[in-house]
Amino acid sequence: MSSRYRVEYQLKAHRKDAFIEWIKGLLAVPFVLHSVTERDNAQEKYRRVFEDVETLINEKITVDSDESLTRAAGVSRLDKLVPTIGTFFTPLPLTEAFLRQNARRAISERAYVSPSFNDIRHILNTAQIVQLARAGELSLVTFDGDVTLYEDGASLAAEDKVIGRLLRLLGAGMHVGIVTAAGYDDAENYERRLFGLLRRLERADLPNEAKRRLCVMGGESNFLFRCYERDGRAGFERVPESVWMSAELHQWNQQDINATLDLAEVMLRALREKLRLPAETQIIRKVRAVGIVPGQRFDPELGREIRVPLLRETLEEIVLTVQGRLENFPPAQRVQFSCFDGGSDVWCDIGGKDLGVAFLQRFYSPERPIRPEQSLHVGDQFAPVGSANDFKARLAGCTAWISSPQETVALLDDLLAELEAQKNM
């Protein structure tokens, strides 16, 4: 009988990343053939694989940027090998990144465990931040909220390590955005979730202009709030849509938006019954979102209210069902929407994080918008089909895929070290 890990792994095909899985397959060959008998050479064999992938990425960038090549050759070799591959906004120094991560993770020293999804994810992250730092043009760093800056459902406390790194980014001249699915249309809710960051900002030795480079994009792309400080007190103020929202979104028909959310709500209610969810489960309708969230139940043994969680498989079933129906619904086809599994709940938002990042790129620099190769989005949800709202951010800029706030801290430490090294060269 397969282990629980193997069973769940096979069930999660829609959560796999085709590019990472393809690289895993390339690395499996030298691992199987050489890892035991020629372990000393494993690093060199893995290095050659990443060198070849690096070359394929560079070729794809060239083909994608040259219309004459695109017309003549059709698509790059990498597009043929990984048909779902997206756009690369920068080259990726994968060879160097592998050697760095190998020094940390001893990938080539392992005789029984082949290079894993997480190994490759970290290598890709390292390659991206090294390239961005060396290019010297990084201008915008955006973050998801839950599981990226703080634990799922938590808030950003003043003692959280990531805050110091965010302040250093602001001090280095970066624009910092928090692009979150949390769809509050008032500043108070964001101030409550990010109170630790605001309190540290008040004490930080940063000019007001640097603090103004911090923004929150709520509801993925629906509500923009900018940081301010008055009389020593920091907070967020809402920015009028006319200042930052694109003309295309202004032209979306409100009836189409309402119809999309109405259908999503009807489906959530039907699925609540069909999947026999706990009676406490709630369906919440907002201005530009609708979601299903776990409720509370009194536990007589504990003597207090506890959350009644929803099964992970149930959350994924809801996401894929609602998304599949909306994709074939004419009003939803005339707008943009995002269905995703938030880890404990499911939401359907109007818009998406690609729009949220793009809006920030234009808001911070209206005359010359920040380009995708000058942007980095850090998030935890990049699965390519359903259930992952950070995935769309890949359309607007470079990305780093993390799995916890601790990984975010480590990633920012590496990024800041690279930026400092380039500054001192």
Swiss-Prot record:
It catalyses: IMP + H2O = inosine + phosphate. Keywords: ATP-binding, Hydrolase, Magnesium, Metal-binding, Nucleotide metabolism, Nucleotide-binding. ATP binds at residues 104, 122. The active site is at residues 144, 146. Allosterically activated by ATP. ATP binding is a prerequisite to magnesium and substrate binding. ATP binds to 2 of the subunits in the homotetramer inducing a closure of these 2 subunits and the release of the C-terminal loop, thereby activating the enzyme. Its cofactor is Mg(2+). It comes from the Eukaryota. One of its GO terms (biological process) is nicotinic acid riboside biosynthetic process. Mg(2+) binds at residues 144, 146, 380. GO terms for molecular function: ATP binding; IMP 5'-nucleotidase activity; magnesium ion binding. Pfam families: ISN1. Its EC number is 3.1.3.99. IMP binds at residues 144, 146, 152, 180, 345, 353. Belongs to the ISN1 family. PANTHER family: IMP-SPECIFIC 5'-NUCLEOTIDASE 1. IMP-specific 5'-nucleotidase involved in IMP (inositol monophosphate) degradation. Homotetramer. This is IMP-specific 5'-nucleotidase 1. The lineage of its organism: Eukaryota, Fungi, Dikarya, Ascomycota, Saccharomycotina.
